[in-house]
Amino acid sequence: MVKIKMPALFRRRSGSKSPPLPQADPASGGGSPAPTPEEEMERVFRKFDANGDGRISRSELGALFESLGHAATDDELARMMAEADADGDGFISLDEFAALNATASGDAAAVEEDLRHAFRVFDADGNGTISAAELARVLHGLGEKATVQQCRRMIEGVDQNGDGLISFEEFKVMMAGGGSFAKIA
């Protein structure tokens, strides 16, 4: 999410929004219906809102990126907060968070750039593919309980060439909802 460029999550462009998160595979055994987009947005927001006060602070934002292994600089955090904090109160509310993550389609080049940033978060070793271990690392950083074996099964749902890894092209299909994959946040 950060390279340390601004993550797609907080990139605001006129006419361009981030792509939707993939839906969980009902066949994966969850048994409950997939959450609505609003429920999923609130769940992701709560991951960021570590102290549960209903708003995301700069320190909570920084802590989340650090837990993902992508510590943001003070300047990057300030820029993300400035772009996200529409009312200027120094915090990101659920409404501000939702506005930044609206799922309307946007400029294809901007979406591609956002996907590349997200892919790099998962591809820790920079080899151009996402392994089960790399997926598990990111999920753990987000507070999700997933074993490497479970991540291998998730990868099988989108691994078009059968190599046990997710390439960028496979990642794009997954993020567009064209494959089955557990939610990432």
Swiss-Prot record:
Gene Ontology MF annotations: calcium ion binding
Alphabetical list of CDD domains matching this protein: EFh
**Keywords from the UniProt entry:** Calcium, Metal-binding, Repeat
* Residues of the EF-hand domain: 36-71, 72-107, 110-145, 146-181
Mind telling me which Pfam families this protein's record contains? EF-hand_7
Q: Where do the annotations place Ca(2+) 1 binding?
A: D49, N51, D53, R55, E60
Where, in this chain's numbering, is Ca(2+) 3 bound? D123, D125, N127, T129, E134
Keyword set includes ATP-binding: no
Q: Where does Ca(2+) 2 bind?
A: D85, D87, D89, E96
Spans through the membrane? none
Instruction: Give residues annotated as binding Ca(2+) 4.
Output: D159, N161, D163, E170
Role, per record:
Potential calcium sensor.
What is the protein's given name? Probable calcium-binding protein CML10
Q: Give the encoding gene's name.
A: CML10
